[in-house]
Design a protein with these regions (language model features):
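Electrostatic, structured charged patches in enzyme active sites and in nucleic-acid/phosphate-binding
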Residues: 1-131, 136-137, 146-175, 179-191
């Protein structure tokens, strides 16, 4: 039986009880970005149980319940990795490779910067784009607006690659409006 990790406290967010503050903070970050929250909705059997002829008890299935599904991306919130989790994670990787190769797995340690970093290469895959609008208007009174596949591409095209991503994360979450002269928003693509 696994030991309980110390300093992990349940937390409520929008009527849902999450098993840890990190999970609740991740749900809040996904919600602020306008992404659907799918929390622990599927159980994956990553190792099938079996019986041995010479043993009375059955070896039980090993099951894994992902913390969040964002499209076909699994987000697992882990502040601390136990030896049990390290082994189970290997079984999860093997299961996904063999059974659901289109599913992408990410483990996040915080609910903001690493979450955006994990999702950033996959916005289009999830049906989103990054809309960047300048705070300055041109001679015609229009602000520069462009859609980008990722924050990284937008930063490179705008010459901001040396700037920190943290303020942009706050802008994507609606906490801060203009960052480095631009408003950053996540926009659902219409297909």
């Amino acid at each position: 039986m696994a030991e309980r990790i110390q300093n992990v406290h349940e937390k409520w967010y929008k009527g849902v009880k999450y098993k840890s503050t990190l999970e609740a903070d991740t749900a809040e970050a996904l919600d602020r970005m306008g992404l659907p929250i799918r929390y622990e909705e599927r159980v994956l059997t990553v190792f099938e149980g079996f019986r041995c002829d010479y043993q009375k008890d059955k070896v039980r299935d090993v099951e894994y319940k992902p913390d969040f599904w964002v499209g076909s991306i699994i987000l697992e919130c882990k502040g601390f990795e136990t030896p049990e989790w390290k082994l189970k994670k290997k079984l999860v990787f093997k299961y996904l490779k063999d059974n659901e190769p289109d599913v992408i797995f990410y483990q996040t340690k915080d609910a903001r910067k690493s979450l955006i970093t994990a999702l950033d290469p996959h916005w289009n895959y999830l049906g989103y784009a990054i809309r960047v609008t300048s705070s300055k208007k041109n001679a015609n009174g229009h602000a520069f607006t462009a859609l980008y596949d990722s924050v990284a591409i937008a930063m490179k095209n705008l010459g901001l690659e040396k700037k920190p991503i943290g303020p942009i994360v706050r802008s994507l979450m609606g906490i801060q409006e203009f960052v480095f002269g631009y408003n950053w928003k996540l926009e659902k693509l219409r297909i």
